[in-house]
Amino acid sequence: MPSYRSRTTTHGRNMAGARGLWRATGMKDSDFGKPIIAVVNSFTQFVPGHVHLKDLGQMVAREIEAAGGVAKEFNTIAVDDGIAMGHDGMLYSLPSRDLIADSVEYMVNAHCADAMVCISNCDKITPGMLMAALRINIPVVFVSGGPMEAGKVVLKGKEVALDLVDAMVAAADEKYSDEEVLAIEQAACPTCGSCSGMFTANSMNCLTEALGLSLPGNGSTLATHADRKELFLRAGRIVVEMCRRHYEEGDDSVLPRNIATFEAFENAMSLDIAMGGSTNTVLHLLAAAHEAGVDFTMEDIDRLSRRVPCLSKVAPAKSDVHMEDVHRAGGIMAILGELDRAGLLHAHLPTVHSATLGDALNKWDIARTNDPEVQKFFMAAPGGVPTQTAFSQARRWDSLDLDRISGVIRSADHAFSKDGGLAVLSGNVAPDGCIVKTAGVDESILKFSGPAKVFESQDAAVAGILTGQVEAGDVVVIRYEGPKGGPGMQEMLYPTSYLKSKGLGAACALVTDGRFSGGTSGLSIGHVSPEAAEGGTIGLVENGDLINIDIPSRTITLAVADSVLAERRAAMEAKGDAAWQPAKPRPRKVSVALQAYAAMTTSAARGAVRDLSQLKGKG
């Protein structure tokens, strides 16, 4: 029977000093036998997805205390990728994931917490907390801040739904007037919450449902809706129950590593493919699996992508569909239910809220239950009022979207495509693989060939696109933007958005060792591995080289003879210390923190996790 971790600091005569400090935080004699549960919050006023979380940690804390635990809250950092986008701030985004994971580990282990409730939301915060939870392996429940309501604006006499990406595209599109761009900007992000499409934040919060670590509705219930409050309260109650089961009954099944097993990662990736989630989720699932000691690889993702169909298309793949529409169609439980009916789900796995995922689907999948409370839950609608306050409205749709033939969520028999929404490509450009969000690719360019137009930074690519250097038929190559080469593996949302604004969204391809925002659509191929800075073939591509892309065949090929590539590689290696670097120095300040990240990180094909082998024999 495991002992409560917290008793290291609360029991025994020699812990009088520690107990004295605990008393100074408000603990009393009666608290020293209770589980101490960390409420891991991520409130910040910098990020709309986190601006409403300030009081929610204490709300969870009070529920933990009512259930018999002691709650202690702390905050992590949170970077807003949208605000950090398009400048050197984006160098810090992916590294912040590891910083968050480490900070959670430091706080939880330093203070011997028994369990955690992780209150996350945006792009790197959920993955960072997930990595920490699987690393520490104590009972945990995830509850996110929830998605933002979609924006609404009237353009040319017609109301259209909007999100952040629409504002970025419109700003670079000359067909919009300054007044129209301002109207779009003012309406695009109307409320608190994670950006309203199937971008990285919402994708990851949905995947925690499939992993079994969060409650039904976590990924799709709007941040503004009153229904979301119960998710937070229930998380507080459940984590205390899980604590007791583990520490008092010896039940290890509640530990995150026994919930997020290999099969659970298969479930999460299958969901990601079915819903056309962000390509960043590949990076984060690989990293989370690494922390869990689960051998889940790009080969597994490739295998799943060949058999799981695309069951839902949400912005940016379908610009008029947002998370509020997914929720109305039954949320993530409905997509998992369709995967289950198609024989594509491991339904026997445990979750934090139900004995098995199958039990949860029987209760929460609106296609198989007539429970009026469940139906009411998924009818939660946007309020349509700009706000930064959680749970501030209780509006409901008049009906559910139960259409599995042509609705927002479809059955496998009526899938948007038999191929899923994500695919792994490989070839001489990317021997270790690369990722494309097929849900966002126009069918006319699933096969594409064109001459390379090479840029050695995102900034150079943006300038090239905006000044007409990129033409229809080109394959834009952006290199030295990988985990090491950036460093930090910047997102390429501005280049893809500007291609769309120039009418080239379905006329060009973009290939990079960097990554893409969840808001990216088009033939955008990222995570090319090995990256240029590690000697990858992408570093040998020259302007005019023909690149052939064949998504149905899962290939990407540089049409250059092996002998020529060998000559180019030899010439590159002959540069010595200047090899595998941009030909011209970039005006980019790389801080000591970023240099340390670059020294330790691995390729995207491994989730950009740390290479601990570098530590062997040192110190």
From Swiss-Prot:
E.C. no: 4.2.1.9
Entry note: cofactor: Binds 1 [2Fe-2S] cluster per subunit. This cluster acts as a Lewis acid cofactor.
InterPro entries per record: Dihydro-acid_dehy_C (IPR042096), DihydroxyA_deHydtase (IPR004404), DiOHA_6PGluconate_deHydtase_CS (IPR020558), ILV_EDD_C (IPR056740), ILV_EDD_N (IPR000581), IlvD/EDD_N (IPR037237)
Catalytic activity: (2R)-2,3-dihydroxy-3-methylbutanoate = 3-methyl-2-oxobutanoate + H2O; (2R,3R)-2,3-dihydroxy-3-methylpentanoate = (S)-3-methyl-2-oxopentanoate + H2O
Lyase keyword on record: yes
Pathway noted in the entry: Amino-acid biosynthesis; L-isoleucine biosynthesis; L-isoleucine from 2-oxobutanoate: step 3/4; Amino-acid biosynthesis; L-valine biosynthesis; L-valine from pyruvate: step 3/4
PTM annotation (N6-carboxylysine): residues: 124
Binding site for [2Fe-2S] cluster: 122, 195
Enzyme class (EC, first level): lyase
Family: Belongs to the IlvD/Edd family.
HAMAP family: IlvD (MF_00012)
Protein name listed in UniProt: Dihydroxy-acid dehydratase
Source species of the chain: Sphingopyxis alaskensis (strain DSM 13593 / LMG 18877 / RB2256) (Sphingomonas alaskensis)
